[in-house]
């Protein structure tokens, strides 16, 4: 019996030969058995999340759904075969993921080849493909890394590290061939560490679904818009991808660098060597030459380089041996648009050949190790795909805060709030207190402009004073102003007309009355100790005038102009 691996390779080769008939794109990639199983796990977890459950899928459910899916797609399932719960939604999600990634699985390849009705004989049946995908006891395991005769922990770790590094190298090459492959991008988005963890991948995934674009196209368009779009086309400040601008920029620029190597190098052998060397140096940057990871990356790069050169030799032999329907005057590649139109085309074909060989590998023996990867064990920043596609928990604020916080908040709410005394103007007695509440917020746009005082003066309550008697004539007003002036000449002043002191005090205006009260109440607090003039108490009799010189001198010192007492007490603080 023929080897199933060779039959799968022949099936894929025929698909590449007839791709214009069976596929929409030449760069359509193929999912192998392991990638099919991982994609089904993601589809099952996504359906569980849509039904109100957690984003999770048990190993038994995945394996049961896997066998059911393979049988139904190959048409080998019986009518009364029991199907898992929500099987229709799981299969729909699985096929949608393949379609958006511009990819096909092995069963899709078999179905498309079967519908062609080719005259070429194909001995590979659906039963053999079912056995190849579900029963792997007849296969000897990993052909690239032989099993060590004396098992030990260190050798097992080296084999596991090499397998992970090989997956990272192939994912970068897959992304160069098919930029729509979200499965490949998820494996290398944070390899090496770029700060693009689960949160960044979740934001990228949500934006991709909203815009109906691939993950790589979303990241590329975001970086290009910021770099080349200008202010008018720049993303909004609320864009969730702005938080990951640095990491996305590093990732996009590195892929651009790989595309430049692919397009500017005409020799496919040199291009393959440069691609693998660039990826290797990017992964081991900052590590010493004797580091185990550096040595493992070097070994994987050399192995892939040797395989690429062997594939190039096979392609060149096939081209020169069989050339039907090709004109002998066929132009060379470098003669078309100076070698830029078809630059890298030969290398793309070689990379497709390499990826097809990987897709034809038999499934892994240890399904638990494949599906249940260690979340804490990350190599070069890579995490398991299931962990990456699971959205991080969002804080919705529905859970109550701790009891101590709530008690402290209630106590702070009941505490009386201290209000700062307002410094009122000297004319505040002429306005109503209700006007103070109408102060607008933009009167003090910043805290630095708010008037402050270390020891504010006490608030003065306005007192309404009314004149008991009107002034008899204007001469009395002029005389009163002369007595309160500080520039009066005492030697030539003469005597004052007979006027009772009580009547003069009662006939002062309302503003002067308030200033005198403020001076008498705050004299001890705001004024420094000084020599105080003795104020003589006038008698109640109207016939006793204040005509002495000492009385005129003391009254001239004590009497101030309107508002002077308030300003003096304010600036003495």
From Swiss-Prot:
GO MF, one annotated term: DNA binding
Keywords: Cytoplasm, DNA damage, DNA repair, DNA-binding, Nucleus
GO terms classed as biological process: DNA repair; negative regulation of double-strand break repair via homologous recombination
GO annotation, cellular component aspect: chromatin; cytoplasm; nucleus
Tree of life domain: Eukaryota
Subcellular location(s) of the protein: Cytoplasm; Nucleus
Region (Disordered) location: 492-532
Xref: Gene3D superfamilies: PCRA, domain 4
Keyword Ion transport carried by entry: no
InterPro entries linked to this entry: P-loop_NTPase, PARPBP
Entry keyword annotation includes DNA repair: yes
SUPFAM superfamilies cross-referenced by the UniProt entry: P-loop containing nucleoside triphosphate hydrolases
Coiled-coil segments: none
Biased composition (Polar residues): 515-527
Task performed by this protein: Required to suppress inappropriate homologous recombination, thereby playing a central role DNA repair and in the maintenance of genomic stability.
Family: Belongs to the PARI family.
Protein name in the entry: PCNA-interacting partner
């Amino acid at each position: 019996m023929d080897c199933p691996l060779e039959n799968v390779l022949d099936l894929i080769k025929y698909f590449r030969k007839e791709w214009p008939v069976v596929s929409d794109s030449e760069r359509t990639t193929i999912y192998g058995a392991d990638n099919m199983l991982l994609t089904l796990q993601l589809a099952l977890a996504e359906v569980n999340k849509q039904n109100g459950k957690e984003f999770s899928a048990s190993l038994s459910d995945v394996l049961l759904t896997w066998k059911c899916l393979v049988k139904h797609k190959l048409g080998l399932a019986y009518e009364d075969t029991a199907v898992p719960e929500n099987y229709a939604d799981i299969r729909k999600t699985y096929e949608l993921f393949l379609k958006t990634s511009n990819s096909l699985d092995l069963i899709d390849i078999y179905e498309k080849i079967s519908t062609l009705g080719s005259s070429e004989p194909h001995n590979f049946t659906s039963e053999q493909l079912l056995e190849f995908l579900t029963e792997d006891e007849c296969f000897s395991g990993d052909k690239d890394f032989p099993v060590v005769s004396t098992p030990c922990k260190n050798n097992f770790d080296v084999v596991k590290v090499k397998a992970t590094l090989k997956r990272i190298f192939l994912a970068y090459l897959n992304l160069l061939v098919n930029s729509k492959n979200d499965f490949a991008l998820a494996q290398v988005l944070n390899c090496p560490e770029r700060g693009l963890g689960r949160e960044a991948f979740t934001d990228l995934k949500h934006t991709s679904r909203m815009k109906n674009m691939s993950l790589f196209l979303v990241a590329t368009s975001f970086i290009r818009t910021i770099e080349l779009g200008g202010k008018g086309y720049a993303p909004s400040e609320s864009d969730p991808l702005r938080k990951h601008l640095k990491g996305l920029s590093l990732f996009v620029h590195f892929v651009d660098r790989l595309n430049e190597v692919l397009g500017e190098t005409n020799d496919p052998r040199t291009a393959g060597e440069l691609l693998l060397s660039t990826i290797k140096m990017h992964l081991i940057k900052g590590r010493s030459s004797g580091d185990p990871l550096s040595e493992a990356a070097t070994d994987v790069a050399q192995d892939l380089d040797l395989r690429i050169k062997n594939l190039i030799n096979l392609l060149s032999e096939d081209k020169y041996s069989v050339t039907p329907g090709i004109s002998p005057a066929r132009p060379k590649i470098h003669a078309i648009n100076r070698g830029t139109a078809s630059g890298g085309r030969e290398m793309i074909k070689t990379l497709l050949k390499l990826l097809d060989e990987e897709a034809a590998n038999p499934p892994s023996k240890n399904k638990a190790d494949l599906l249940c990867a260690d979340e804490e064990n990350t190599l070069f920043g890579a995490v398991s795909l299931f962990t990456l596609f699971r959205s991080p928990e969002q804080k919705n604020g529905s859970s109550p805060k701790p009891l101590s916080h709530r008690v402290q908040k209630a106590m702070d709410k009941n505490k009386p709030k201290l209000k700062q005394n307002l410094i009122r103007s000297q004319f505040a007695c002429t306005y109503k207190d209700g006007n103070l509440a109408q102060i607008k917020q933009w009167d003090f746009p910043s805290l630095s402009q708010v008037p402050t005082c270390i020891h504010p003066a006490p608030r003065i309550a306005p007192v309404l004073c009314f004149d008991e008697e009107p002034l008899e004539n204007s001469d009395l007003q002029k005389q009163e102003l002369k007595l309160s002036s500080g520039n009066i000449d005492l030697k030539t002043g003469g005597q004052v007309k007979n006027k009772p002191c009580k009547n003069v005090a009662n006939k002062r205006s309302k503003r002067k009355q308030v200033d005198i009260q403020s001076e008498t109440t705050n004299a001890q607090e705001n004024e420094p100790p000084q020599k105080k003039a003795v104020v003589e108490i006038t008698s109640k009799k109207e016939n006793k005038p204040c005509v002495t010189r000492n009385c005129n001198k003391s009254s001239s010192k004590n009497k101030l102009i309107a508002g002077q007492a308030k300003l003096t007490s304010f600036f003495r603080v």
